[in-house]
């Protein structure tokens, strides 16, 4: 039990972070206007009449760009705490992060060579 002693604030954070979306969604469901006519079920397109079908198939290139973006966004998520504590971690942590960046760069070069980043 002594190991978990300092984690009360973390537990409180997770409970509050879980309750905020639940409360927001519940409040919006309780306070929303009821009813509505057939106009309410139509697609909203910037205040003008919808043109064409709402269901279209996106080009796969959008997904490839999104995937590459997410990979490098997660890289930033991992690199920021490392950069903040860089002086305390020492040389071994530097080489671990260097290997991490090299692996990501290999993935970027692979995606680039496969044409995943080309838009033509």
Curated annotation (Swiss-Prot):
Tell me one Pfam family matched here.
Oxidored_q4
Where in or outside the cell is it found? Plastid, Chloroplast thylakoid membrane
Catalytic activity line of the entry: a plastoquinone + NADH + (n+1) H(+)(in) = a plastoquinol + NAD(+) + n H(+)(out); a plastoquinone + NADPH + (n+1) H(+)(in) = a plastoquinol + NADP(+) + n H(+)(out)
- Under which main EC class is this enzyme filed? translocase
Q: Which domain of life is it from?
A: Eukaryota
BP-aspect Gene Ontology terms: photosynthesis, light reaction
Q: How does it sit in the membrane?
A: Multi-pass membrane protein
| Entry's EC annotation | 7.1.1.-
Which keywords describe this protein according to UniProt?
Chloroplast, Membrane, NAD, NADP, Plastid, Plastoquinone, Quinone, Thylakoid, Translocase, Transmembrane, Transmembrane helix, Transport
GO molecular function, a single term: NADH dehydrogenase (ubiquinone) activity
Q: Which GO terms describe its cellular component?
A: chloroplast thylakoid membrane; NADH dehydrogenase complex
Residues that span the membrane, as ranges: 3-23, 64-84, 89-109
Does the UniProt entry include the keyword Chloroplast? yes
Which coarse location class applies to the principal site listed for this UniProt protein? plastid
Stated role: NDH shuttles electrons from NAD(P)H:plastoquinone, via FMN and iron-sulfur (Fe-S) centers, to quinones in the photosynthetic chain and possibly in a chloroplast respiratory chain. The immediate electron acceptor for the enzyme in this species is believed to be plastoquinone. Couples the redox reaction to proton translocation, and thus conserves the redox energy in a proton gradient.
Q: Which family does it belong to?
A: Belongs to the complex I subunit 3 family.
Which PANTHER family did the record assign?
NADH-UBIQUINONE OXIDOREDUCTASE CHAIN 3
Known partners and oligomeric status: NDH is composed of at least 16 different subunits, 5 of which are encoded in the nucleus.
- Protein name per the record: NAD(P)H-quinone oxidoreductase subunit 3, chloroplastic
- Organism annotation: Nephroselmis olivacea
Lineage, highest ranks first: Eukaryota, Viridiplantae, Chlorophyta, Nephroselmidophyceae, Nephroselmidales
